Amino acid sequence: MKRNIPYIVLAAIIIGIIVAVKPWKNGRTSLEEGADTTAVQSGYYLPAEENASNQNVQVKTCIYMDNSGSMDGYVNLNSEFKDALGKIIVKSNNYSITTDLFFVNDAIYDVQQTALKGDVNNFVSQLNASNMKVGATGSSNINKIFKMVLDKTVNDTVSILFSDFVYSIKGTDVSSQVSNAKNATMGAFMDAIKRNPNFATIILQCSSQFQGKYYDRNDNPIPFVGTRPYYIFIMGSYDKLKYLDEKLALNNSNTGIPGLINKYLLSSKSWTLDENTAQALTTSYTNSLLIKPERNGFDIDFFKFDNSNSNWVFAYALGLSNLFVDGSYLTDINNYEVEPRDVSVIKAEYTKDPAALSEVTQFSSPLVLQFSTKRTVKTPNFKVRLLNKIPAWVSNADIPDDQGAVPSPKQTFAIGSLIAGVYEAFQSQTSGKPIFEFEVKINKYK
């Protein structure tokens, strides 16, 4: 018997090491605090709201302004464009280690080497169409600009690029040229993701007063006074963009950035929700007589139906403040998929319902997903996914050709293809994985 003791001790040590190294959490895969999250994540759990870890993020911000002739109209007057640019500069200067300004067209030009040198906080008050004429401003190649800016987006750097983002496409074969331009955009962003698997991007569509010349895809000038869209691309490491997203007040589509219309956030993250970020609601958003959750509040012990209803309606509250997704995307029910298809999402909203709020006090601003299924369907479990798609607003903002005409105030030539190029670069890393998913187990129905 004594001869077996060393083997028993050795086995106990091995088991102890396995238990210590592998994180266990109610049978689910967990992610250790501070662990590397740069790879595409699937099965890792979205951090609970109290576990935000972006308080001491070190950021060096570089702000680039496309100063080609097509941008003159935004600075010829005190416009929303100048207001937004000024606010981002001032806030960035407050929350970043350094904030540097550049003009960009055929090359990158440091503002401190121009007539606008000095305190960055005073940059916008001095900016006009004359003193920003640095470099080859006659036209711009947006893919060349992307490449130059992305090549400098390294380490602690976040790049913020202001432009109208209009492809210069000459000739009659518009479709194939746009396709080629989109592929070049995708290539530039794929290179950035290869250099930094933790790379992310925020796209803001903004609106501004405009007084100047609109240049169509052939670079033909059209005098125009009115409202035009422009875009802000914020690019860098995921944790640094999450930090600036909060500090620059970009947290949702109601941000204080003047003229903001839409927002799109892209990364290679894929998360799973658990009891720390999703809870069943029992007193609101339901027509059931009784819902009894499991002790964790996540899975369901049993449902008791009101048999007079043909459909059964129930809901989950989600705490998603650590999710890198705009609120407008989360409240679009077309972005969700439920398996099996007998269950569907019929409402997605940030709740103000007192009963719901009292059940999930741990969530600062709970998103409620309301589900519906036929009373006759009694599935033992169901899986919910937030799909990774291009937001609906992008196709609405796109116009396939602008030759000889100024598009409507919210439309930009080929912007849908440009953003699709960025999206497909990220999709090359995520392989179609959802932004998040969670699975609910139901023990029984009554």
Q: Positions of the model-derived regions?
A:
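Structural alpha-beta junctions
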Residues: 90-100, 183-202, 240
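Von Willebrand factor
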Residues: 53-163, 167-168, 201-203
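Well-ordered, non-membrane alpha-helical segments in soluble/globular domains
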Residues: 76-88, 129-147, 174-192
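Extended non-globular C-terminal regions
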Residues: 279-446
